[in-house]
């Protein structure tokens, strides 16, 4: 009887859990995602550049010998679980279980996926970092910094399509109050980002991140009332994501788990996530430093 009810609960709440999970993952649809269901590691392969050769009549056609560059992604296993006491949710009243699943567990899983991606982005070497004071900048991210990030990606033949700029909301606040953006009327293009919408600006699709409890965007406290964030100007295929448990991309596997735990007198509501990410092309990611006032 209890097993049947548990399965009914999963069928009832799983679609909503998946929707909330995706809605709370700002970066979930940005980078290429691989189905690694049942695996602890996942290998992705990138092909290097090849240079053609001039045609010589009667001669053999030489091979370009483009390199094969494998990268192994290690998946991290996370539980996002809450116990719901029997007295809070009887087998007939599922409201407490539903609230735990959709308001606590699923959002936490979505934020964790973002954090795994952010942590992987921050592993890129400092070769192409843009300093917070580039070209005389005083705070936030300037027009020149955006242009320079775009130029660096273009210099390395990174495709123009699917370029993203990932930054915290505190950077957006400064951009919207900076004279150079306002006078060029770019403020009109940026303002929808205040509502969490994806905006196109300066050759990038901009995504602004909240200060999530999982860690959020990497930063350094300058101990002077300011912090310096690591932001990222990057291409969609510069980083690969692998998702096992919690894969909602057509695997048919429920994301929600509801288990009865008699010794605790509770239901265990869980949105497990097995996920990993790795940089596959260093030249496709530019770390941009942004100095902003610290927020409580």
Segments predicted by a language model, with ranges:
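Sequence/fold signature of self-assembling virion shell proteins
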Residues: 2-29, 33-49, 69-78, 92, ...
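Short, solvent-exposed loop/turn elements at domain surfaces
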Residues: 51-55
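Short, mixed-charge, low-aromatic patches
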Residues: 1, 56-65, 101-108
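Charge-rich, low-complexity amphipathic helices
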Residues: 35, 39, 66, 120-131, ...
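Alpha-helical scaffold segments that mediate packing/assembly in large oligomeric complexes
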Residues: 88-158, 287-296
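Structured, hydrophobic secondary-structure cores that serve as assembly/anchoring elements
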Residues: 41, 61-62, 69-97, 147-178
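Extended, solvent-exposed, turn-rich assembly/linker loops in the middle of proteins
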Residues: 126-197
């Amino acid at each position: 009887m209890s097993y049947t009810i548990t399965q009914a609960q999963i069928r009832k709440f799983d679609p909503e859990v998946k929707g909330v999970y995706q809605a709370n993952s700002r970066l979930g649809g940005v980078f290429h995602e691989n189905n690694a269901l049942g695996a602890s590691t996942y290998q992705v392969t990138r092909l290097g550049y090849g240079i053609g050769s001039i045609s010589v009549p009667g001669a053999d056609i030489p091979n370009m010998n483009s390199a094969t560059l494998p990268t192994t992604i290690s998946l991290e296993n996370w539980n996002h679980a809450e116990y719901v006491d029997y007295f809070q949710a009887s087998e007939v009243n599922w409201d407490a279980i539903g609230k735990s699943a959709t308001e606590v567990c699923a959002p936490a899983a979505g934020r964790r996926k973002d954090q795994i991606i952010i942590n992987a982005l921050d592993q890129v070497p400092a070769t192409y970092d843009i300093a917070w004071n580039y070209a005389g900048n005083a705070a936030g991210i300037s027009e020149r910094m955006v242009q320079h990030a775009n130029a660096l990606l273009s210099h390395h033949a990174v495709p123009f399509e699917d370029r993203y700029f990932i930054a915290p909301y505190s950077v957006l606040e400064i951009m919207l109050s900076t004279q150079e953006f306002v006078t060029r009327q770019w403020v009109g293009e940026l303002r929808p980002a205040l509502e969490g919408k994806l905006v196109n600006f300066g050759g990038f699709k901009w995504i602004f991140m909240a200060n999530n409890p999982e860690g959020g965007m990497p930063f350094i406290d300058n101990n002077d009332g300011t912090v310096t964030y690591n932001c990222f100007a990057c291409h969609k295929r510069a980083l690969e994501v692998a998702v096992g448990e919690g894969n909602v991309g057509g695997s048919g596997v429920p994301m929600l788990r509801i288990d009865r735990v008699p010794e605790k007198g509770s239901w265990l509501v869980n949105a497990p996530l097995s996920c990993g990410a790795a940089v596959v092309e260093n030249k496709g990611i530019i770390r941009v430093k942004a100095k902003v006032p610290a927020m409580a």
